[in-house]
Amino acid sequence: MPSVGIVIGDGKKEYPGKLTLYVTVTCIVAAMGGLIFGYDIGISGGVTTMDSFQQKFFPSVYEKQKKDHDSNQYCRFDSVSLTLFTSSLYLAALCSSLVASYVTRQFGRKISMLLGGVLFCAGALLNGFATAVWMLIVGRLLLGFGIGFTNQSVPLYLSEMAPYKYRGALNIGFQLSITIGILVANVLNFFFSKISWGWRLSLGGAVVPALIITVGSLILPDTPNSMIERGQFRLAEAKLRKIRGVDDIDDEINDLIIASEASKLVEHPWRNLLQRKYRPHLTMAILIPAFQQLTGINVIMFYAPVLFQTIGFGSDAALISAVVTGLVNVGATVVSIYGVDKWGRRFLFLEGGFQMLISQVAVAAAIGAKFGVDGTPGVLPKWYAIVVVLFICIYVAAFAWSWGPLGWLVPSEIFPLEIRSAAQSITVSVNMIFTFLIAQVFLMMLCHLKFGLFIFFAFFVVVMSIFVYLFLPETRGVPIEEMNRVWRSHWYWSKFVDAEKNLTKVVI
């Protein structure tokens, strides 16, 4: 290949390339990594409402639920041990994401996906055959280790493999897989709840999505970015040519090598994140995943059956309602695949925030009007139940085409290569910290804040929408290695990012 002069600056650069069948299939297979995360989110809440599961592992919760059926509905499921069962996974995911950063950088994205699948598979088997609470907890920890690795590697893999014009749509495949996993889990919970040992099938069924990503990672190629990072220049060149479906890849391969050479000068990527020029990246790595969880979505998806049961639905009706929200989740995520590269990230963030705000206030008013502050139960009229489910579905739809997919897409596409693995690790870690905290205290918050819990999350939706409006630049249609120019042109972040244009010549 001849030497090529590459200008990296504020001028927009367009790399040639097509949306080939090869890259589409590759990204679909990789996106399946989201199935394990989604399946766990959906299965946990449903299993905890099954009488046979409660009787075996959490008898105090079961007895309290049956004994106090006519008392405060807000506090029926308030149990430290029950919430620890759900939230312990996220502490494990937090720890493993830090290790996954090193593995992803040194050994490639696909190795991290493979480890994630194997660990999740082991946890699923242990949970399926559990006979004591400690087996459940250890199984949950293994599941968490697996999720930490996949959530670290899959979004990066998708952003690096996809042509920049289609990066948003292909990356959202990860979130779509999460929503499909949630839906499948809710459907299985509904059917398995009829069987006395159905909880074993629900928990053990996690082996299936684990095997999908495990086998998938064995046949997937690694990304050209990762190959170059590990010195495999010729292999990366051949792979990029196959991925893009064109021979003219000189500009893109040179920019990838420039980014790789810059990354090698960084001895301590974690410490480097604290440098002034990476201030916008670090801010987004922390606040976007934190805000994603403060929308309250995982409260709905974790505990949808518990929540619906709490507000007066029967056990079967609660699981059916959870299936309905799961269907909405999948459908709205498909909308985001269409719209993210057409309407842009900022539009979806802001529209979704407004829609979530209205829905949360409406749900709070509906639940508050029915149960008041003392949680006095009563028979929920059918029309009233439909109204509650309708607004929850509107809320889920808003999240599913905004903060759901974009909470993973935007961080994975804005980090330069030299800090990419470390910054993505922070994104996953913050996501898991907030997921753990909210999952751990949700039932207690429901007991004390009552319907005000939805107002609590609505407040943060307002805060995050203001943040997006003021501080998040549009990243649609910007090549991943050219992302620095969006910070240079931003009214605030330009103060931190070096505005000088660099002219670099690289000879391969």
Swiss-Prot record:
GO MF, any single term: symporter activity
Gene3D superfamilies in the record: MFS general substrate transporter like domains
Transmembrane annotation, as ranges: 23-43, 80-100, 118-138, 141-161, 172-192, 201-221, 294-314, 317-337, 347-367, 383-403, 426-446, 451-471
A cellular-component GO term for this protein: membrane
Keyword Cell wall biogenesis/degradation: no
Protein name: Sugar transport protein 12
Cited NCBIfam families: SP
Cytoplasmic side: 1-22, 472-508
Membrane-topology descriptor: Multi-pass membrane protein
Biological function: Mediates an active uptake of hexoses, probably by sugar/hydrogen symport.
Keywords: Membrane, Sugar transport, Symport, Transmembrane, Transmembrane helix, Transport
Compartments in which it is found: Membrane
Family: Belongs to the major facilitator superfamily. Sugar transporter (TC 2.A.1.1) family.
